[in-house]
Amino acid sequence: MGRKKIQITRIMDERNRQVTFTKRKFGLMKKAYELSVLCDCEIALIIFNSSNKLFQYASTDMDKVLLKYTEYNEPHESRTNSDIVEALNKKEHRGCDSPDPDTSYVLTPHTEEKYKKINEEFDNMMRNHKIAPGLPPQNFSMSVTVPVTSPNALSYTNPGSSLVSPSLAASSTLTDSSMLSPPQTTLHRNVSPGAPQRPPSTGNAGGMLSTTDLTVPNGAGSSPVGNGFVNSRASPNLIGATGANSLGKVMPTKSPPPPGGGNLGMNSRKPDLRVVIPPSSKGMMPPLSEEEELELNTQRISSSQATQPLATPVVSVTTPSLPPQGLVYSAMPTAYNTDYSLTSADLSALQGFNSPGMLSLGQVSAWQQHHLGQAALSSLVAGGQLSQGSNLSINTNQNISIKSEPISPPRDRMTPSGFQQQQQQQQQQQPPPPPQPQPQPPQPQPRQEMGRSPVDSLSSSSSSYDGSDREDPRGDFHSPIVLGRPPNTEDRESPSVKRMRMDAWVT
């Protein structure tokens, strides 16, 4: 906004009048100079102030200009103050340019009133429409971009089948400044006894690391729940430990899965919400098979019919500098433990939800009753491995005795050699099997084999069941905790075959 114009009347204050005279006199002479140079003319100014003091300005020589003036007898333009005021009024009403070359501003009462009205309107607008102060920036420990169509589009709260509280689901909308860090290293679960047992479904799990919809930390002792969050319940008996930077948080998908069995290829599926996992943490999360993934999608879609859909985003989770242990969701406090405990009805709604590292439902109650794992599993949380000489004997419905054998001395992270020593100690306590022809060792797969190597995936295993291998083409994966599968002859393999698989893991 330009300089505020004053009313053109006589200034009553002597000091202000003198200052105004000095400034405007110089301004008038400056304009006269510009006009003389620009338009090639001669200008003479004669000014007498209120005290009759003379001030004059001439573009060349005052006497020369005055001589021309006295000798000039032709008709010419002569203006006074009244002429200037009249010219300004015509300009204001007609909107045309004033023929007056004088640049001094003359404000009429009508013009002054208009300026006052404009100033009042501007002041009222500034008072009524104040700019809201900027919100403080929200600091997160890692970058998670979740574009959604609505702020509450991630809250799936169907009480019949959804097993995740609204507060936990709403925490993924990133509306508060809570620290969003990888999941808890101690994952708990409250499971009601008496639920039917289901063996884990098998299927083709190859190539699922980059497009899987749910990744459960291996050996965490927990199963997937309604919309993909790993359930965090307060059960002191079921304590698992995930590896470094393992992420178990998955958003629900938008489109329902296509009908069919577990042998559908990944190319036939519509692009769902995926978790892009950095390479440093891919090896710690064995993916679900295709059949389990389809069942999980069906359950999530059935539990979220009344909610708003997602915009099919891709969640990028990068954890470049997070410590190996001690990573918890601060947005999932233990205050939700008593409010959202699972019942048998909720568990029966989970049709076929059995991840490779899941505890079957019948044996979970035995874990809760006998209070097992306080020594061995607490060492899992601290170092990601079992302590020396810790034994776990669990009697389940199928009379399977599972023991954890002593392993190599504790390290920061279990190495392939330490895993071989554990397997060799288990094999030494078994009777020697009949000799079998040594099969051709398989060629190591460069990326997918290492993605599911026991270096990371079995760092949290609390027991090793002889015969719990997955029946899938990826024979190099040993499920760390599978208590509900009945042993059969197909699963039992000789130690030589396992030794061959361990050689493939090491590479």
From Swiss-Prot:
Entry's Gene3D superfamilies? Transcription factor, MADS-box
User: Where is the DNA-binding region?
Assistant: 58-86
Q: What is the effect of changing residue 408 to D?
A: Rescues sumoylation
How changing residue 275 to A affects the protein? Reduced p38 alpha- and beta2-mediated transcriptional activity
Q: What sections of the sequence does the record tag as coiled-coil?
A: none
* Clinical condition linked: Coronary artery disease, autosomal dominant, 1: A common heart disease characterized by reduced or absent blood flow in one or more of the arteries that encircle and supply the heart. Its most important complication is acute myocardial infarction.
User: By what name is this protein known?
Assistant: Myocyte-specific enhancer factor 2A
